[in-house]
Amino acid sequence: MTSLVYFSSASENTHRFVQRLGLPATRIPIHDREGTFEVREPYVLIVPTYGGGTTAMGRDTSYVPKPVIRFLNNTHNRSLIRAVIAAGNTNFGESYCFAGNIISQKCHVPYLYRFELMGTAEDVERVRAGLGEFWDHLDDEEHEKWRRPSQTPSTRGA
């Protein structure tokens, strides 16, 4: 298995989820304004979804936290992403875990899973097992089955 990279805001929800996974993980710094943080190996990104909204140019980038955008704008970091997992809040309706959709589409990587807030014990088990299976089959032709964001499981039926 290869590494996890994640971002967590001051709420620490994503951080707590990653800790419960018990897998090697690296946190994207909250205050890396220059985007100089770099990874050294392929990774799966775990990211929270922010509130969203449309910019003056009509682009909707605010679902993805700015430190994650800076991190992925680094071509080295972007070249090593292999998949994304998103966290969110079902109170946001259709925007639930939307950061995962955006990153999956823009980086051309599978969207493996989504979970609410800091996840349930079942989410932790599913992600842990799913990551093992994902890394084991990354080079197989079957890896295409992972490209189904609309079918990722969610808690509370969202």
From Swiss-Prot:
Pfam families: Flavodoxin_NdrI (PF07972)
GO biological process: protein modification process
InterPro entries reported in the protein's UniProt record: Flavoprotein-like_sf, RNR_Ib_NrdI_bac, RNR_NrdI
GO molecular function, one term: FMN binding
UniProt xrefs under PANTHER family: PROTEIN NRDI (PTHR37297:SF1)
Family: Belongs to the NrdI family.
Function: Probably involved in ribonucleotide reductase function.
Protein name as it appears in the record: Protein NrdI
Organism: Rhodococcus jostii (strain RHA1)
